[in-house]
Amino acid sequence: MNAIKISFYRGLSNLLLAALFCGTVQGQGRTEYLLEKNWKFSKGDFPQSISPAFDDSKWETVSIPHDWAIKGPFDGNNDSQNVQIVQNGEKTASLKTGRTGGLPFVGKAWYRNTFVAPAFTKGKKAVLLIDGAMSYPKVFLNGEAVGHWAYGYNSFSIDITNKMKVGKNTLAISLENLPEASRWYPGAGLYRNVHVIITDEVSIPVWGTYITTPVINKDFARVKIRTQVNALSGNYTALSLQTTIVNAKGETVASATKTLNEGDLNEFEQDLIVRKPELWSPETPNLYAAITKLYAGGSLKDEYTTTFGIRSIKYEAEKGFSLNGVYRKFKGVCNHHDLGPLGAAINVAALRRQLLLLKDMGCDAIRTSHNMPAPELVKLCDEMGFMLMVESFDEWKAPKVLNGYSHLFDEWAEKDIVNMIHANRNNPSVVMWSIGNEVPDQSTKEGGKILKFLQDICHREDPTRPVTAGMDRIKDALDNNFASVLDIPGFNYKPFWYGEAYKRLPQGMILGSETASTVSSRGVYKFPVVPQKMKMYDDNQSSSYDLEYCNWSQIPDDEFVMQDSLKYVIGEFVWTGFDYLGEPTPYDEKWPSHSSYFGIIDLAGIPKDRFYLYRSKWNPEKPTLHIVPHWTFPGREGQVTPVFAYTNYPSAELFINNKSQGRQSKSKATSTSRYRLMWNNVKYEPGEIKVVAYDANGKPVAEQKVKTAGKPHHIVLASDRKTLMADGKDLAYITASVVDANGNLCPDAENSLSFKVTGNGTYKVVANGDATSLELFHLPKMKAFKGKLVITVQSTEKAGQLNLSVSSKGLKTAVLPIETK
């Protein structure tokens, strides 16, 4: 089993070497194993499987992260819920068939892993760290119980030293997902990573380092580091801690050594000065590393590295939010944790792809709705430049679902908040904590007390960041002073309350913690084109003219107006960045709908038209000119077919078959006319539409064309990656488009496509973004939706080349090579 010395983040490794049983990284006195491969898995209840002698040879062999339910099949009876959704304006309960995705995640299952940790010898300490397990994990080592947790979204650690053996060890983990425990698809299984950390008895515990930057200016930054030490059991007269801070180039920029004498509290506190600090921001995500070395009796006992950033955040009444002294508004999205066709199983390449899409849109912030994020997401946000609102709960004591967090709150809430903060408080991307989302406790007598209880825990564990919560019962929250207690009052879907709330609240600021909830299906256009609330159609789709929304929500433009007009509103987090499994509003009762319509980007990762509306608003540095809709509407000849342009240019002219339809300019007449250019009365005729954009001086600066498509002729493949790492985990996403003989997208094509991967890669999953599709993600075939779908391929551990071929009856086969190295 090989070992390498590497850099760590948050006291944990960010580079892991695959070995026979697991990955391993080793520093002086510390070795970490990633238990990734050769797990045995079975659904059902097998309490006898805790025994090392248990025969699991007939169980499925899996690698983790693993989501046991994502392969389906879809069924409207899976976790169907007879509930009344108050936010939807419902007066009575009704059967919701796709609320949690229609996947078979309810039930019990077991995982087993037999591993060897060569670094574990007599006198060593062993800790098991689980980043997340869905849900109610109970952990057994070598036949004996060692610990448990309840909340499936949280990270937790267990000291397994007393049950660990030199040589072979058997780890068994039981999990159980209850019915009616969620409002969206939660995933199932060991969907995040599992680590075994071996140290000396004298060591620094998991999350034992806490880094803050209390003083920052252009000349220097003061970096304060508090480091805990595990209690001593040896005859050491003194401990000393050496900390070295290095920049991204590996250059030492500060260092300090401190001695801890016998009788002192087991915590070091150090102050280091970094000259001319390079500050962290979404635009410049500069990072530093604090290398920690712990000595006892002159002997090096522990060594690891914590990545952090230097940045200042302020939230000021009347002025709003500033980062590094620059006032700005959050251009954020809310995201659930599933990765579309991959389910809840975490994958760094999939997360990075999501973030790259959001970055191109101009997004600079993410709300981890409605739970703790995977550490990989937080790390990527540090590196790529996204601010994070890290959220904890969807329920407090008042329930929303039958078996939700309300049953856990009294026993687990403080433990869960503490773990959430300790796991994420060194990350510069994290700029606020959220303690809840739309909790019914807003309206109860006890709600304010619960809020203060949770907020006080956050302040105690991390006084450097404010606390918010997403409120939807605004009148109640204002009348009973619930909203007054929060550091940052978060409003969900209430832009028209901002003015009154600002007058009544003491904070002097408001956050749009959840906004818009516009619904649309990529490539679908409905007529007539008018704003509509909870509009439903026979095909279970929603229009991409982006004027349809929910009972509680608005179109994007309404929120834009308030964000632009009110200085004290500090930004927004749109619901949602990506479509997700579950919550198919407005079709909650209309199977086969089983995934959301809210996303700016669909479940396959293809941007909807709305992406370009947000891009035109949020990313002014990059030109945006996008035409809505496509121009292939057989049977609509002579009928009114509005054309929209989403652009950051002030005006544009529309041409249909080279005939001008007039120039439109943005105006403040309505919310939509401020942010969209609209030709509402044009009539459809086949051919070509062209939009020419003009700058502020009236000069033509950009144009875009859309042509009427002919019959499907061939397939075009486009990959987001040209080269993959040969690590057995890296992913490429290939968009397959059905086009006519001239290369125009066939926007209604539903051809069934088949996929084959040869060479040094494997087929992983496919998705088409259709919320009604019951085709299974893991099978190598699927119908195109509105002419497109996305195939995901995975590298092997052997370098070379993989080849993807996509075929369909009557169409020319397309082949795409991708290098792996």
Range-by-range predicted roles:
Residues 31-35, 42-45, 101-210, 232-233, ...:
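Accessory beta-strand-rich segments of carbohydrate-active enzymes
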